[in-house]
Amino acid sequence: MSLIVPNRLGRIRNVDHNNVFQSVLMDVQFAPLNVPFPRRLQTASIVLWILLMPLCVALFLVALSYRWLLPFVLAYLIFMYIDHSHEMGGRKIGWFRRFPLWNGMRDFFPISLVKTTNLDPSKNYVFGYHPHGIISLGAWVNFATEANSFSSLFKGIDLRLLTLESNFNVPFSREILLCKFNLMAALGICSVSKRSCDNILTKGPGNSLMIVVGGAAESLYAFPGTNDLVLKRRLGFIKLAIRNGASLVPVYSFGENDLWDQLPNPPGSMIRKFQKTFQKWMTFAPPLFHGRGIFTYNYGILPFRRQVVSVGMLIFT
């Protein structure tokens, strides 16, 4: 079967669908069948994490389809409306921070955390994370879990990773985000709102937070081998630290931008205009990216197996 299409010069040429399909198929790099079982478990950890929010949405929609569950759904929606735990420090579930899933995610890339200095637990800190990348996986593994033993490295520091307020509007997923994971000291995923930040930094000594400074806008610059940051209009975290007497800890994750490939979107292009318009109305930007698959190395939505190393340095205010 063939299709007649114009070429770049405007002339008509035939395109053989079979040849196109064969060309694409030959370009796919399939994973071997004899991959060691631990690596399969690592891949499964990433798949589960990637599908976490879609599964929560699907579970909510399924619950809506059963009439006998509607009272419970209504009660949960009311609870979502009146509950502001994401602005008050989260809720504690002690075992979740050390859940084996996070170790699988850590080893998949791998992701590591380098300690360069001690932090005084009697003070408060504002961690500024760079770069955002596509999803900030380095921030999640190193600072929202105990996969790399953050609490052991920085004893007495009660760190909370912050995310967009809109993420707490997804049913069921919000409960996972709100879990405080540390068995010894509380740690929860919280809102990045001003109220949330002030509440955390005024809870007492050691209470600290991490902000992914570049936010959604920075994800549009996340290309492998690049280190472009969005900082010029993102100085609110410095004012936050000064207002609350906290010290700044800039953190950079080398390799964060290498985890996915992104469709080129130079400023002024149609793709970038669409992304900026989408961000204006939805508060987050939709990067058009691809990675690897479960059984392929170069096509899919999973991140590539590329190393991420997070390094920080204390700055006193």
Predicted regions and their residues:
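Soluble catalytic domains of membrane acyltransferases
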Residues: G104-G312, F316
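Membrane-anchoring hydrophobic helices of lipid-metabolizing enzymes
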Residues: S2-R195
